[in-house]
Amino acid sequence: MFQIPVQNLDNIRKVRKRVKGILVDIGLDSCKELMKDLKSFDPGEKYFYNTSWGDVSPWEPSGKKARYRTKPYCCSLCRYSTKVLTSLKNHLHRYHEDEADQELMIPCPNCPFSSQPRVVGKHFRMFHAPARKVQSYTVNILGETKTSRSDVISFTCLKCNFSNTLYYSMKKHVLVAHFNYLINSYFGLRTEETGEQPKASDPVSVDKILPFDKYYCKKCSAIASSQDALMYHILTSDAHRDLENKLRSVISEHIKRTGFLKQMHIAPKPVTHLALPPNSSAPSIAAPPPCFQLALPQNSQSSGTVQSVTVTPGTSGSLTHSPPTTAQSHVALVSSSLPVCQSSLSLQQSAPPPVFLSHSVALNQPVNTAVLPLTQPVGPVNKSVGTSILPVNQAMCSVNQAVRPGLLPLTKPMGPMNRPVGPAVLPMGPSVNSGVLQATSPGVISVGRAVPSGVLPAGQVTPAGVIPGQTATSGVLPTGQVVQSSTLPVGQTAPSRGLPPGQTVPLRVLPAGQVVPSGLLSSNQTVPSGVVPVNQGVNSGVLQLGQPVTPGVLPVGPPVRPGVLQLSPSVSTSILPMSQPVRAGTSQNTTFFTSGSILRQLIPTGKQVNGIPTYTLAPVSVTLPVPSGGGLAAVGPPPQVPVQFLPSGSGTQMGSSLPSLPSPQVLVSPAPSVFVQATPPLADANQALKQAKQWKTCPVCNELFPSNVYQVHMEVAHKQSEAQLCQVCNELFPANVYQVHMEVAHKQSESKSSEKLEPEKLAACAPFLKWMREKTVRCLSCKCLVSQEELMHHLLMHGLGCLFCPCTFHDVRGLVEHSRTKHLGKKRLSMDYSNRGFQLDLDANGNLLFPHLDFITILPREKLGEREVYLAILAGIHSKSLVPVYVKVRPQPEVAPKIPNKQKLTCPFCLSTFMTADAYELHLKERHHVMPTVHTMLRSPAFKCIHCCGVYTGNMTLGAIAVHLLRCRSAPKDSSSDLQVQPGFIESSELLMVNGDVIPESTFPVKRKLPEGHLGPEDQRDGEEPQLTLDADASSGSEKGLGAVPLKRQKSEIRTEGSGPSEDSLQALALDPSKYEGRSYEEKKQFLRDYFHRRPYPSRKEVELLSSLLWVWKIDVASFFGKRRYICMKAIKTHKPSVLLGFDMSELKNVKHRLNFGECESQKL
């Protein structure tokens, strides 16, 4: 760039000096004026000394700039930051308790954003407001529409693989299913009863029974009006963040990225219901979609004509009739995704129609027309109901429930407080939580316990005052009791079911020769011999199959315990008058099965569902009673109904876990009769439902069964061979041998176990382990899977770390002693663990709690001591699993000393037999150059070399011994007879040694034998050392002796086993390696380092010579030189080399002539 030169520099410099002086004078005058102002205002020395430069110069940066924190959750009160919101809350609670309300942060439920509650609320209204969502569609070339892509966030339980999209549901599942022992410490129930008793006519007083503060939290004394409200408080309140840490530790979050969802091309047709004109006395009411649909033949129609009856889920229980249609009748209760009390039920006639009973059926709605005798009572029922069936055109009353009468036309007059129920009400019973048939004990099928009640003959109205002063649940009227027409007093329960014609009474034995009292039957009905009231002394609880029943009414009494309910087919296939009794002997094909005999007929279907086998049981026969009109009972051939039992569950949890946890299906086909056992009351049923979710493996046949089916399977399949597991040696023994085994084998251990000491409970850290799955862990250091048997040996090999200090222990005794002496009384973890969410379960006294045991292992008594040790092991600070793994370590039982018998010892290599152990060991030393030993870490029998004491690992063969002897430095190198191995021994030995155990070679996969001297690609790629065969005169290294060795190794061995290197080849080396042949590895490494300084780029011949003379692998020598060259080149690039010349550089500057340095010998630096 061209610039005009400046002229008149002297003048410019003079003016510049003058201008500078003027500016100095102006500045000085300004400072003097400012000083006068400051003197007029004197705040005092206190403010002067307390003022810093940052106060008067805010525009300049004061102090060092704070480092940016990359973690999402940062504390504004200090420099703390974390990745987990819970850790930030714990930090605020611990260090900033006073300012915690200022720094309280909550996450957005729809996105990762988190901030203060006010900011999050504003953010939610701006970005996630529940406004009208405009569905965006994309149209492809064909004109088809696709919805936009959406991501679904799901949570999974690490304990049982239960998944849900709601975080609250997951926390509730984990608390109820896996941390149920913590519920009692939070849930509180007030037991104070209200003073006045509420009246039935006062609806307001009913609400006073359950006060709004009936439930409360034991931790923070918060009150709740219901269990759900209390559960919501416990799981969402900030006061219980410690509980959230425990629950969050077993919850895994997954983001499922779903692609474009294709729309359905054909819309499903809506289900239409045709309604009849309503009756004059019962106006129809519009209702939401029905939960039950019944189609049954009417009285005046043929069996092929069906009338559809719809029961709406409304509170009024109204029914709408549909016009009759011609169809076949069948009954199906099908599982659906509807809410509770919603399902569908239709009835047609087919052969054989299935009956499906699922967990979502709730039969608490009255249903018109015919009924099913095989039902499961579901839902809360406030009145006692019976197990019989009310006939058609029979009305029924209920006084314990307030309902609106007048919804259905009544065929008979009722009392003033009667509840009208349609003819042939579907039978109901006490609630058992779900309408599922489940097998709860061997040989029986649980249906649900229903308290029976009295029944009425067809066409008779229930009188209100039948049994004065007592309830009608017994079903028996005193002899001579007159039926009165009055209302039933409050507190009595009326029978809810009648007995259809041809149906046997499913409870209790009726002695013959008894007469039914007149208060139960109408005047035109008789009772044949063999039918008696229930109040006669009978203890069996089972109705005999040979006893027929009239179409009239039989009293049924409540069983004392859950009895056996029998379902039998119809007694006849003809038309019987209503007044004609059923004669004895009409049911001839019924047989009496003993308890448990039905499930002995387990027939495998050959199919599997997710690896679980399915079975088929014996058939069951169910009679569908068909009511008749005009005094005649038209009883057709009974349709045989196979019942499929589906797994039962409760609530949303079971509905969500059913798809992920399939259960074996038990199909019951038609049979003459079947026994059904009623389930116990509500508490026992809940326990049975919990047991149905557990799976057990049969120790005999190694099959997987649910816990309830497992009991049946053990009784049916293995009844003859009932085996018991010995808790000491973990072996199965028959029942008759188990007691003898315990007395003989473990007599000393049992006597000592009676004096059991208190177990030690410790917590430790194992950062090298990663918990993979049940009973299996992975060692990150060894990169291998560790089983339950090897777990403790592996832990002690790497060492267990103390949670309170950096100490590491390789024995359990040292860890126990260290915990007693150094950390006695310490209950809280260090900051490294607590900040990352690690927590240990402690009781009220501060002792460790072990809610379950993941591993049970055994250690020798000399390493463990006499006490059992419970270990809670954390998988390191940086582990993703925050739940400790609980391990129980038991001392190895002292087995009674066995009497030494004279057993022959067999050599595993040459199959020679010896009578004494000394002769056996001498043979191994002289013949095979090995001696027996025990593996140091695995504690398993092994062999070691007698020359170098190295322990053989892996597959122990004669070929491996021969190869080792060629490489062994301590073994003699001559060709004497003691080092020669006979080829016949190698060829004839078909045994392999794996960790000292003799295993026949036939158990391993057999390879095709190749011709001698042939080397295939598989042999060349094999990583293991192959067998080596030597001849008697193998000194020359013939081809026969080297036939099993790879070609490259043969060449290298031939070169190394020949005569030593020549003098010419040694001249090619920069240094002589002959004196380092027998030196240690470090000395050889130092020689190679010196050789590298002389020649950093050795030739291939030099590398081979160094490898053969130093007895080092050639690849090791080459890699050593390459590594050193890389280090030097990297150092040259990063560091500037400097040379010290040996004289003063200041004096060198005075030298005016050139410097010439001559060549000199390089010295070793």
UniProtKB/Swiss-Prot annotation:
Cell compartments where the protein resides = Nucleus
- Coiled-coil parts of chain: none
Q: Which UniProt keywords apply?
A: DNA-binding, Homeobox, Isopeptide bond, Metal-binding, Nucleus, Repeat, Transcription, Transcription regulation, Ubl conjugation, Zinc, Zinc-finger
GO MF annotation: an example:
zinc ion binding
Q: Provide an example Pfam family for this protein.
A: ADNP_N
A single GO CC term for this protein reads: nucleus
Give expression by tissue: Expressed widely, with the highest level in the brain.
Name the Gene Ontology biological process terms: nervous system development
Query: Would I find Cytoplasm among this entry's keywords?
Result: no
List the stretches of this chain annotated as a DNA-binding region: 1090-1132
Comp. bias regions, Basic and acidic residues: 1009-1024
Q: Which SMART domains match?
A: HOX, ZnF_C2H2
Task: Find the cross-link Glycyl lysine isopeptide (Lys-Gly) (interchain with G-Cter in SUMO2).
Answer: K146, K1009, K1048
Sequence segments annotated as region (Disordered)? 303-327, 1005-1068
On assembly, the entry states: May interact with SMARCA4/BRG1.
- The protein's role, per its UniProt record: May be involved in transcriptional regulation. May play a role in neuronal function; perhaps involved in protection of brain tissues from oxidative stress. May be involved in erythroid differentiation.
The entry's family comment says:
Belongs to the krueppel C2H2-type zinc-finger protein family.
Among PANTHER family, the record links this protein to: ACTIVITY-DEPENDENT NEUROPROTECTOR HOMEOBOX PROTEIN 2, NEUROPROTECTIVE PEPTIDE-CONTAINING PROTEIN
What is the protein named?
A: Activity-dependent neuroprotector homeobox protein 2
Q: Which gene encodes it?
A: Adnp2
